[in-house]
Amino acid sequence: ADPGQQNKPDAWKNLSFDELKEAVHKYTYDVLYRLKIMDCAPDMVQIGNEIRSGMLFPDGAVPQYRQLAALVNEGIRAVRELLPETKVMIHLDQGGRYNCIMPWFDSMFNAGMLPIDAIGLSFYSFWHGTFMDLKDTMSRLIKLYNLPVYIVETAHPWRHCKGDHISKELMETAGLDAGSAEQKKSLEIIMQIAAEVSKDTGKTGVYYWEPVGVPGKGMGTWFENMGMFDEHGRALPGWDAIRDFDPKNPPIKELDKYIESLYEYEETPEVEDFMKLLMIHGNLISNPEFKDGFNNWQIETSLEEGQYTLGKDGVFISSDANFDYSISQTVDIEYTGEYIAAVDYRGTNTTGVEVELFMDVEDESGVHTYTSDIFPDDIRFVTHLLKPVRLQKNARVTVGLRMHTPPVFAKIKKISLVVI
């Protein structure tokens, strides 16, 4: 399960809500009982996995917080009944984004969620904000809820992926590039952050997902570069970071200053060239920066109107539930030539986020679609380009942005179409 995948098991698909609650309680109790009789009772139990969008859809999908709280409570009760000494954790993604985490916990406690013993966060630097965002989020959560906070999922690629799961473009938002030394440094930073912010509670931890993932046939793209062993099964330097870490003698001096130095950006030559073309030839999109509202734009979405609004930075989209969103404009091409589409986009990222810039072309030869995946960056607006497309005179072209995503926020500043 992750924020985009929280469906019920097939065996539970037709249960009533009361039956579903009973099934959660029984399943949790039975699994823990088997562990207990084998003398393997856990010290801590996490109810659900990355449940910021909910769990057991559709019954427990956010924003149905009361129903979600009722389901979570059945898991908590099962733990308390069988293993009263075992701690209970709730685990969310977006570890570097306090404004995603705090409202969720407030909503759940207000909806009747039972007391818990710890907060667990996922933090992947290429999805979940900067390292400083992580430090700020952990500090504020500890202070607000008086609970220890753990990093229960993290990883960093030890090489660039042969597939496209963790691309070079995505790693541009991570502060550190892919590499075995960078994996070690990422772990040092995260462990030092956790230790520093948890001095008063004295309780924290960092868990790597998944250290024993070794590249191999049928293992999937995550294991191409996210484990802590290389393709020959040799341990990577990241293990040294774990073995040698001492909170009393941390590896990084002046941590905040070091983190700040990691995030320096320059526009790519391709974007610089595009900006020059935009100034020379102009934008074929009407109302490209939404100064005239949504005039000339077509929108298709599962969101309510209040969840996508206009502000000084263009379109702002925010949802606490999974959603689809598409915004586009159709242009008739007057001259044959090569054209580039672009979008200035800023937004949060996590597991299951799908955002793409697209161009649908209708001409004498038929209908053609061109797309470019966007890897969101919530630190700044990034200009994303579609590779040049040759368009014929009288072609009808639709340019826009599509989103299919778990709960995130997004900003669309400008959409462009320029002839080369």
Residue ranges and their predicted role:
Residues 1-2, 51-55, 96, 125-127, ...:
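Feature marks short, surface-exposed loop/turn motifs that line or immediately flank catalytic pockets
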Residues 2, 63, 136, 140, ...:
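Aromatic-rich peripheral "rim/lid" segments of glycoside hydrolase catalytic domains that contact
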Residues 1, 47-49, 90-94, 121-123, ...:
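A cross-domain feature marking catalytic cores of carbohydrate-active enzymes
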Residues 85-87, 100-172, 188-196, 200-202:
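Glycoside hydrolase catalytic-domain groove-lining segments
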Residues 3-110, 114-116, 128-138, 144, ...:
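Active-site cleft segment of glycoside hydrolase catalytic domains centered on the general acid/base Glu
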Residues 255-420:
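Extracellular and organelle-lumenal recognition/adhesion modules and their flexible linkers in secreted
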